[in-house]
Amino acid sequence: MAARKQSSQPSRTPVSYEDVAVSFTQEEWEYLTSTQKTLYQKVMSETFKNLTFVGSKKKPQEPSSDLQDKNEEQEKSSSCTGVFKGGPFFFCLTCGKCFKKNTFLFNHQFPVRSRRLAVTNPQSRKGKGYKAQHRGERPFFCNFCGKTYRDASGLSRHRRAHLGYRPRSCPECGKCFRDQSEVNRHLKVHQNKPAASNQAGNQASNQRLKSRVPPTTPRSQAPALKYVKVIQGPVARAKARNSGASTLNVRSNSITVVRSREKISCPYCHITFTMRTCLLTHLKIHFRRQPNQHFCCKESAHSSNTLRMQKIYTCPVCDSSFRGKESLLDHLCCQRPIRFSKCWEILGHLLGYLHEPVVLGNIFKVRDSSGKRMESRRRRRKRACTENPETEGLSGKGRVAPWEMEGATSPESPVTEEDSD
């Protein structure tokens, strides 16, 4: 009877996740769309959860050594994208790799470089500057224009531009946008608009600003409202440029800056400019008095810097030009108070400061009408010291010795040699 009961009951064999799971190769996984990949991941995760819930009541049996070797060979041969072994249910949306825990998936998508590991073990992989695995990879591309994106959300947001689909709208003005982030960015424009009470108070100051702005053509004013940019930043305190208005308190976290293509026209001619500085430079042409005019040659320069760069100081001897007086004096004096240059000596002879004549830059000594040679100041002083030592107290380079005085005799007294020329 026991044998009949055993034969009547069907044989129960354990079912593993590998028997139920459906795997794809790398080529098959690339042909799947994003929606098919998402559906596949959801189905496989539910299947794995059901199997783990049923198998949790019984203690899992240890697999044999042959089964372990077979699983290891299959894991090595299978690629990381699309092939699921062992029942993971957390998937990477970029490459399709699967993980058992959510933390493993997070570490796979956002690997962090460990500073402690870099210090303790500089030869490790992370210590050498471990990069993210998906950095620079853009697997999702648009079929219309070919642009690539890192995730499916960016691709879906881009497709709305081709289809003209703008589901989000502004609650105040009704303008439509592609996503909520653009709506939130657009709402800051409405928040920075002044109230009705402030508009009446600022009307006078706005008229002052308009009066100072040069006249523009109405054609150039038309596209000014199309270029609006919002600059986010801390609370700022701004002041109107070139106006007598008081400072403007900006109490919001963003400042609206209107980009305009207005061209400022010259009031004296029909030339237009995009920058006020260019207009001010151009207005110097219409002035009666020429700006940056040199006091000597009466020539006007484009700017004061150009006037400063001119070499207006020239040497009267060698015709060398310099920018300042200091450079000219350094040239004449050779930057030394004792050693004078040839130009300074020639100029001194021409002006009468030096007694020795100079011809063509060569200094030479000549004799006067009586036939005597002209002595220099140093030579005359030395001769006067040797002739009258009592008054001067000096003889040559040193002090006068007692035996050198008048009336003294000494065998070792020095003999002064007079110049015999």
Curated annotation (Swiss-Prot):
The record marks R178 as: Crucial for 5-methylcytosine recognition. InterPro entries: KRAB, KRAB_dom_sf, Znf_C2H2_sf, Znf_C2H2_type. Residues 191-221, 371-421 are annotated as: Disordered. Keywords: Developmental protein, DNA-binding, Metal-binding, Nucleus, Repeat, Repressor, Transcription, Transcription regulation, Zinc, Zinc-finger. Its main location: nucleus. Disruption phenotype: Affects the maintenance of DNA methylation imprints. The absence of just the zygotic function causes partial neonatal lethality, whereas eliminating both the maternal and zygotic functions results in a highly penetrant embryonic lethality. In oocytes, its absence results in failure to establish maternal methylation imprints at the Snrpn imprinted region. Intriguingly, methylation imprints are reacquired specifically at the maternally derived Snrpn imprinted region when the zygotic Zfp57 is present in embryos. One of its GO terms (molecular function) is zinc ion binding. A zinc finger (C2H2-type) spans 90-113, 140-162, 168-190, 264-286, 313-332. CDD domains: KRAB_A-box. Residues 15-88 form the KRAB domain. It is found in: Nucleus. Belongs to the krueppel C2H2-type zinc-finger protein family. This is Zinc finger protein 57. It comes from Mus musculus (Mouse). The gene is Zfp57.
